[in-house]
Amino acid sequence: MAPKAPNYKLWAKMILGGAGIAVGGPAFVMYISPTEEELFKRYNPDLQKRALESRYERQKEYDDFVTELKKSAKSDKNIWITQQIEAEKKEKLARQMASANAAAEQARMQEEEHAKIEQMRREAGLPPTR
């Protein structure tokens, strides 16, 4: 039996259908998706006011994040490794600050305790300890 001739019409329909789905689907989603301004207009007034008030902080956080990413990207190491190293450095610094604050707080509490003892000694008519 002789081989069948290819059905070019069927192939053309399938290619056009696939292209229509591959291009038309995302285009349709973009067409029906609301823009940020349209979403913002749908907020109630309280949410709009809060969003406007916190816009600067969110923008600053995003800019800081992008700056950190750019710094990490300049390194020869993998970006995830450099970010982890930076996070560990920040955590270590925070722990050091916390321990320094705790030591200062402890010293302040000891001073207060000593001052209370001295006050009680004065009230009792005893000489100071120092």
Swiss-Prot record:
Question: Where does the chain cross the membrane?
Answer: 14-34
Family matches, as InterPro entries: Cbp4
Subcellular location(s) of the protein: Mitochondrion inner membrane
Q: Name one GO biological process term.
A: mitochondrial respiratory chain complex III assembly
- Does the record bear Transferase in its keywords? no
Query: What keywords are assigned to this protein?
Result: Chaperone, Coiled coil, Membrane, Mitochondrion, Mitochondrion inner membrane, Transmembrane, Transmembrane helix
* One GO term describing the cellular component: mitochondrial inner membrane
> Basic and acidic residues bias: where?
108-124
Coiled-coil parts of chain = 86-125
Mode of membrane association: Single-pass membrane protein
Residue ranges of the region described as Disordered = 99-130
Q: Which Pfam families match?
A: CBP4
Q: Does the keyword Transmembrane apply?
A: yes
Name the family the entry cites. Answer: Belongs to the CBP4 family.
What function does this protein fulfil?
Answer: Essential for the assembly of ubiquinol-cytochrome c reductase. It has a direct effect on the correct occurrence of the Rieske protein, core 4, core 5 and apocytochrome b.
Q: What is this protein called?
A: Assembly factor CBP4
Q: Which species expresses this protein natively?
A: Pyricularia oryzae (strain 70-15 / ATCC MYA-4617 / FGSC 8958) (Rice blast fungus)
What is the taxonomic lineage of the source species? Eukaryota, Fungi, Dikarya, Ascomycota, Pezizomycotina
| Gene label | CBP4
